[in-house]
């Protein structure tokens, strides 16, 4: 297909939370390849409202990385950015109680799916001097009891971005620290079944953030992710950045 003039952005984890809010923020601003394991009513509405600019790739991010890039090129002729947002928190368990297979599943989603998608995106992003925007976490640099698998996966993301910044100077690669966001993941964290593993103090900390209204709105993070995806700033490449700097 002939290359479109608008930016073409691939977005993972697009069916809910930060991903859905980002898809909404990108309306009228870009062509979007929305990748998700499920098609929620909210995402389906976006697809119906934007038939010429939104394409859905349904599947697990561990399986559709290459195919999603190919879809972008086939449909729109180029790729300008990837926003890699899909991720999971579970297993929530202390290391001594860890199920190594559950760790592997988490790393497949949070890290290896990212590496695979980035690998296949790079040749196209070189042509457009595009951007790689990956949702990281404060947990990459801070200990939370029973979150070792998640913390380690996000620390790996930050190092991946540092290496990308060195290896691909024409592509802006950033890891974004989103803060504590009001998403389904936070609902899971506050579940009483996690209190024993996390410890009462940590568990109560997250519950108090919700009750005191301190959680960040997904729409605020979406503004930052959209801005970064649409604007290549070489000075930022390889960095772990705070979302507040871009809204």
From Swiss-Prot:
Enzyme category, top tier: oxidoreductase
Name of one Pfam family that matches:
adh_short
Q: GO CC terms on record? A: cytosol; nucleus
Supply the alphabetized keyword list: NADP, Oxidoreductase
Q: Which GO molecular function annotation, any one, does this entry have?
A: oxidoreductase activity, acting on NAD(P)H, oxygen as acceptor
Record has Oxidoreductase as a keyword: yes
GO biological process terms held by the UniProt record: tetrahydrobiopterin biosynthetic process
Q: Does the keyword Lipoprotein apply?
A: no
Q: What is its EC number?
A: 1.-.-.-
Q: Which residues bind NADP(+)?
A: 11, 85, 119, 150, 154, 181, 183
Q: Name the residues annotated as catalytic in the UniProt entry.
A: 136 (proton donor), 150 (proton acceptor), 154 (lowers pka of active site tyr)
Give the top-rank taxon of the lineage listed in the UniProt record for this protein.
Eukaryota
Family listed: Belongs to the short-chain dehydrogenases/reductases (SDR) family.
Q: What is this protein called?
A: Uncharacterized oxidoreductase C30D10.05c
């Amino acid at each position: 297909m002939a290359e479109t003039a608008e930016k073409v952005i691939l977005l993972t984890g697009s069916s809910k939370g930060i991903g859905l809010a980002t898809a909404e923020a990108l309306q009228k601003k870009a062509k979007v390849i929305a990748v998700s394991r499920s098609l929620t009513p909210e995402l389906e509405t976006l697809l119906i409202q934007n038939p010429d600019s939104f394409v859905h790739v349904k599947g697990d991010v561990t399986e559709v990385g290459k195919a999603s890039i190919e879809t972008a090129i086939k449909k729109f002729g180029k790729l300008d950015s990837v926003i890699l947002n899909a991720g999971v928190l579970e297993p929530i368990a202390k290391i001594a109680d860890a199920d190594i297979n559950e760790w592997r599943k988490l790393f497949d989603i949070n890290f290896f799916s990212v590496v695979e998608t980035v690998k296949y995106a790079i040749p196209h992003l070189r042509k457009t001097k595009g951007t790689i925007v990956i949702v990281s976490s404060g947990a990459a640099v801070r200990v939370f009891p029973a979150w070792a698998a998640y913390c380690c996966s996000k620390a790996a993301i930050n190092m991946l971005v540092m290496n990308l910044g060195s290896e691909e100077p024409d592509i802006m690669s950033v890891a974004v620290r989103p803060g504590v966001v009001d998403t389904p993941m936070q609902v899971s964290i506050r579940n009483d079944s996690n209190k024993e593993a996390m410890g009462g103090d940590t568990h109560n900390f997250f519950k108090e953030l919700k009750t005191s209204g301190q959680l960040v709105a997904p729409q605020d993070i979406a503004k930052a992710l959209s801005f970064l995806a649409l604007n290549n700033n070489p000075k930022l490449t390889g960095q772990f950045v705070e979302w507040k700097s871009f809204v």
